[in-house]
Amino acid sequence: MYEPKPEHRFTFGLWTVGNVGRDPFGDAVRERLDPVYVVHKLAELGAYGVNLHDEDLIPRGTPPQERDQIVRRFKKALDETGLKVPMVTANLFSDPAFKDGAFTSPDPWVRAYALRKSLETMDLGAELGAEIYVVWPGREGAEVEATGKARKVWDWVREALNFMAAYAEDQGYGYRFALEPKPNEPRGDIYFATVGSMLAFIHTLDRPERFGLNPEFAHETMAGLNFVHAVAQALDAGKLFHIDLNDQRMSRFDQDLRFGSENLKAAFFLVDLLESSGYQGPRHFDAHALRTEDEEGVWAFARGCMRTYLILKERAEAFREDPEVKELLAAYYQEDPAALALLGPYSREKAEALKRAELPLEAKRRRGYALERLDQLAVEYLLGVRG
């Protein structure tokens, strides 16, 4: 029970299970794992796919002949295991050239380098069968406002994304581009901070239909926002192209904790939302094992992410099927035809009728919504004492 299978569409990045445990205050505590070994290990655990940055697979500066050998060896592992590569992304944050931005660098040569690196990563992803290209603007931010750069960066990023979308069309790549917001880190402030800001920006692009979102649990939580609401907004806009699942304590650095390890109630309602919405994309765990762990702990972390998701899925489905929950929700969502007749699309007649209508406000002011009981039922399902 709760055993992951490929049909659950769970994915991990090479950088997640491959995280060596380095942090700003300490060196690596684990050896780098061979990407081919990671592919075989994830397949053993029941994962659907593996995602990657360009440099996770091909170290920066690798000669072309060696690059081709690496790709052939990696593709062989994919063929042997059946694992997919649903998503790729370019590392536009590690190279010192990107210290003041990649697409938003004030130096046009750096912007050109970032764009070329992105095109090459798109080529790599196409070789591996990827259909989603994530753009994380981690270095696209500032600590100093004296430059006035905040007035210029939108044009630079728009230019780069429009170029990438046109390149994808010209090459016959079927990419959907998923933009990943984050409020800060590594920059003091990142220009594309939240799901809402990314949604607004997408509509300024030449091909907005090719662009959507890759929201991350930790990133919205860092800003003190409600991730379930952010994902619901992305779903409503038809823009949830990909999702990063992890966990996070509010107002901390980006912790990338094991999914469900901190905000269990939020994780419960996130799984409830994803599973009830018809979302068909990957469930990607952008997290990593604690620095305390050896390799065995890394795979315990990976198993834990998937197992927690499946437990929450089962608990959420049972919660929604509970007769008392259904009864409470039926009472919560009132469908009074007289009130509904005053709502909906505008007409002059409806506006006049609305102004004339006698609204039962006294009764509505006294109404109770039974949310305490409904929420308690959710808690009891989470605690495993009901259903």
Swiss-Prot record:
It comes from the Bacteria. InterPro entries: Xyl_isomerase-like_sf, Xyl_isomerase-like_TIM-brl, XylA_actinobac, Xylose_isomerase. One of its GO terms (biological process) is D-xylose metabolic process. Keywords: Carbohydrate metabolism, Cytoplasm, Isomerase, Magnesium, Metal-binding, Xylose metabolism. It catalyses: alpha-D-xylose = alpha-D-xylulofuranose. Its cofactor is Mg(2+). GO terms for molecular function: magnesium ion binding; xylose isomerase activity. It is found in: Cytoplasm. Binds 2 magnesium ions per subunit. The active site is at H53, D56. Mg(2+) 1 binds at E180, E216, D244, D286. Pfam families: AP_endonuc_2. Its EC number is 5.3.1.5. GO terms for cellular component: cytoplasm. HAMAP family: Xylose_isom_A. Belongs to the xylose isomerase family. Homotetramer. PANTHER family: PTHR48408, XYLOSE ISOMERASE (PTHR48408:SF1). This is Xylose isomerase.
